[in-house]
Design a protein with these regions (language model features):
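Rossmann-like NAD(P) dinucleotide-binding subdomain of oxidoreductase/dehydrogenase enzymes
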Residues: 13, 24, 53-207
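Long amphipathic alpha-helix in the N-terminal Rossmann-like dinucleotide-binding domain
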Residues: 2-17, 27-57, 66-71
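Glycine- and acidic
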Residues: 1-4, 21-34, 104-108, 226-228
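Short linear capping/connector segments at secondary-structure termini
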Residues: 22-29, 61-66, 258-264
């Protein structure tokens, strides 16, 4: 526990600017999004995990004057495989760290789009005192690494955050290999969502617009909590439409190195092409109207204009 509390202190102090900068440059987060993720949330994860671990150990069966009862927790018989996403540096650190904190050896496969901040996380853990061989980072082809890991007899658990279909594939492969493992693997996963905003007729129009625009376009909508659809009363729509256009057009787009930019590039070309195809489809669909935005350009970066359809 002391090691990870020290890691939290290192991130809060000497590594704060470095891990924020890595998250901004390599994951294209603006300064605000980087600070609340790579610094604040990661520090909270590490400190809260220690607190929760303490509570777990403190929760013991009752003893009597002539009988002492104690419940001990031990690590799994094997290693935990941590698979982490690009969109939150905090989650990328938390998944391997929480398993290691409970005494497990971890193989950590970061996203290929999060390598820079992953390296800094490992530097922090080493300086804090995590021994060599406890958290083992593996870079490479995700499918190849995962298939190799899941084929090992010593595989004892997976800690995953990512897309639903990938998690289903992993679960299926674990099931196919279940006869091969030493023990029954523990499976923990957090997957994507399709979040929405619902507005009541009594709601304040400006507040609804803020909820939609900020909810949809923070970090270019690249998180499971992003608002990707909205349901609003017809009576509210004329005023809300104008407010949405005003608010969306006020967002500056460009490099995260300019602290005035709210919108930055999407994570990679595959994401850019997917979003551009949706915009193109909307332009061709007679039943769809692009309220604001609708432009994209990858000549100097993977920039998608914030778009409401």
């Amino acid at each position: 526990a002391a090691i990870f509390l020290k890691a939290a202190e290192l991130i809060a102090g000497p590594y704060r600017a470095k891990i924020n900068a890595a998250t901004m440059i390599a994951q294209s987060k603006n300064i605000h999004q980087a600070e609340i993720d790579a610094a604040c949330e990661l520090i909270d994860f590490l400190r809260f995990n220690v607190e929760f671990m303490t509570q777990i150990y403190a929760d013991q069966p009752k003893s009597t004057s002539d009988m002492w009862n104690r419940l001990e927790y031990r690590p799994l018989e094997g290693f935990v495989y941590a698979i982490t996403p690009f969109n939150f540096t905090a989650i990328a650190a938390n998944l391997p760290a929480s398993a290691a904190m409970m005494g497990n050896v971890v193989i950590w496969k970061p996203s290929d789009s999060q390598v820079f901040s992953a390296k800094i996380i490992i530097d922090v853990f080493k300086e804090a005192g995590v021994p060599d061989g406890v958290i083992n980072v593996v870079f490479g082809d995700a499918l190849m690494v995962t298939d190799t890991v899941l084929a090992s007899r010593d595989f004892a658990g997976v800690h995953f955050t990512g897309s639903t279909h990938v998690f289903k594939d992993i679960w299926a492969k674990i099931g196919m290999n279940i006869h091969h493992y030493k023990t029954y693997p523990r499976i923990v996963g957090e997957t994507g969502g399709k979040d929405f905003v619902v507005a009541h007729p009594s709601a304040n129009v400006k507040q609804v617009a803020t909820g939609i625009v900020r909810g949809a376009f923070e970090f270019q909508g690249q998180k499971c909590s992003a608002a990707s659809r909205a349901y609003v009363p017809q009576s509210m729509w004329p005023a809300l439409k104008e407010q949405l256009i005003t608010d969306t057009k006020s967002m500056k787009m460009g490099s995260p190195e300019d602290f005035g930019n709210f919108i930055t590039a999407v994570i990679h070309e595959g994401s850019f092409d997917k979003l551009a195809s949706y915009i193109d489809q909307a332009k061709k669909d007679a039943d769809a109207e692009i309220i604001v935005g609708g432009n994209y350009d990858k000549s100097v970066g993977y920039f998608i204009e914030p778009t409401i359809i």
